[in-house]
């Protein structure tokens, strides 16, 4: 299929466009304040849409019909679909939770309260699928943490607190054994939006208030570098490409007309390109 999903502003409708002829195939009413980030099943047959007021809908692009709908929150930030097409996760602002749904019928499988060490709640900033890791990656707005949530059938147990022995059969301490165990990565500053490198080993994140980005290695679970990115980079719209034999990241900025080019080997900003807006 060669289709576009167009979320219309103002009249609460969605249009499915033929990508070859740019002609509407199906126009249907949607919930109000629909999020523009449509997500798709791996085979491209189904599109998932979330509204700001917590409704998640599933639509069949073969039959051009709605399939299922569920409400997951009062205020939802965004959604992600697992790489195997089995699960959908919704990151919520109110209540501060993560809702994991069966992507088939949108039934709720697990609701995770988003809390820190002292039970302080946090809104969700963003959630994305990390396909090679078979996990969801979540950024928290009010607590400086990144969460990795595995959706594998037999996930590796995640330590909860101090562990004396990791040897199989002799493990001591508390473990989150799943399903959907939460691995917490603690940072110095919270992250509002982020971007993966092609290997999905590194996450590049930025906050709304800061003039710099953080590079977090998901394998070792800590920040490994900082990137000078003033002007509030919009990393969700970033891309990577090869330039003069090296891998670089290009990211636009929200507060000024500029695009920053970052060398992904040493994380230096090698060029700043002014734009018209």
Predicted features and spans:
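Predominantly soluble domains enriched in secretory-pathway, periplasmic, or organellar proteins
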Residues: 1-277
């Amino acid at each position: 299929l060669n289709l576009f999903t167009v979320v219309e502003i103002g009249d609460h409708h969605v249009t499915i466009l033929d990508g070859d002829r740019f002609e509407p195939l199906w126009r249907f009413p949607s919930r109000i304040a629909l999020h523009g980030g449509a997500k798709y099943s791996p085979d491209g047959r189904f599109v998932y849409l979330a509204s700001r007021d917590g409704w998640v809908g599933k639509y069949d692009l073969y039959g051009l019909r709605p399939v299922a709908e569920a409400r997951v929150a009062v205020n939802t930030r965004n959604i992600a679909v697992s790489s195997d097409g089995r699960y959908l996760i919704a990151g919520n602002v109110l209540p501060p939770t993560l809702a994991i749904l069966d992507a088939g019928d949108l039934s709720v499988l697990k609701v995770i309260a988003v809390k820190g060490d002292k039970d302080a709640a946090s809104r969700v900033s963003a959630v994305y699928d990390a396909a090679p890791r078979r996990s969801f990656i979540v950024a928290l707005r009010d607590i400086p943490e990144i969460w990795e949530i595995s959706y594998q059938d037999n996930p590796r147990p995640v330590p909860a607190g101090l562990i004396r022995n990791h040897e199989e059969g002799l493990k001591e301490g508390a473990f989150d054994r799943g399903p959907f165990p939460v691995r917490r990565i603690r940072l110095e500053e919270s992250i509002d939006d982020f971007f993966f490198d092609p290997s999905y080993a590194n996450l590049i994140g930025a906050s709304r208030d800061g003039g710099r980005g953080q590079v977090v290695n998901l394998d070792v679970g800590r920040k490994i570098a900082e990137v000078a990115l003033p002007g509030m980079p919009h990393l969700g719209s970033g891309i990577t490409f090869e330039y003069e034999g090296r891998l670089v990241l290009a990211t636009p900025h929200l507060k000024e007309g500029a695009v920053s080019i970052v060398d992904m080997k040493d994380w230096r900003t090698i060029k700043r390109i002014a734009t018209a807006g």
